[in-house]
UniProtKB/Swiss-Prot annotation:
Keyword terms: Malaria, Signal
Organism per entry: Plasmodium falciparum (isolate fcm17 / Senegal)
Pfam families, A to Z: NAP
The protein, known as: Aspartic acid-rich protein
Source organism phylogeny: Eukaryota, Sar, Alveolata, Apicomplexa, Aconoidasida
Record-linked InterPro entries: NAP-like_sf (IPR037231), NAP_family (IPR002164), p53_tetramer_sf (IPR036674)
Presence of the UniProt keyword Transmembrane in the record: no
GO biological process: nucleosome assembly; protein tetramerization
Domain of life of the native organism: Eukaryota
Amino acid sequence: MYLFIYIFFFFFFFFFFVIVQKDIEQLDIKCAHEQMNIQKQYDEKKKPLFEKRDEIIQKIPGFWANTLRKHPALSDIVPEDIDILNHLVKLDLKDNMDNNGSYKITFIFGEKAKEFMEPLTLVKHVTFDNNQEKVVECTRIKWKEGKNPIAAVTHNRSDLDNEIPKWSIFEWFTTDELQDKPDVGELIRREIWHNPLSYYLGLEEFDEFDDDFDEEFDDDDDDDDDDDDDDDDDDKDDDLDGDDDGNNDDNDD
């Protein structure tokens, strides 16, 4: 009888728990959609500023090549990439294209890049569905003979003496899922796009160095504090030993 009552109340409360939890999840979804709508509004307001910024960037030779290679996660790209990226005249991002946060990234190269590849405009469009990434558009690159940087990557990976892993940023232009490589799209949309000048000037590297230095400095301080505590404990032990010796001498007298 008691077991039956226990089971009844268990399922009764479990049923209402599930209902409440679903209501919470629905509110979370609604909140995410409203946040996305606000983000879209401000993205729209930023467009004229991004266009002005792009006009300035196009007057700086090699801006995007230097910006991309100075990002810590992209510092290991093969040198052949830099030769091609030096002709990258425009990088464009269309972000938050729907409520799931889909985005499109476009690389536009100058005419001199024809000696390496065609076409000169590379596009990758990524969508999300239930947190699953799906590539719905990706330009297929046609490399000129002997100019494919991915071939250089293959050579480096086969070199057992090469301790530094190398990869090509152009490997990202694929519909396949990349393993053990940075997600170029996420790096651009989340970090580089919003303030490329800081990467171009190498300021982000200094920030990381400062953070590492602060952590090491804090660790050293902790070690010094521990050493000081140990010294204080030793001094107290010495004082106690001295008092014990003095008491023993008095007793002997």
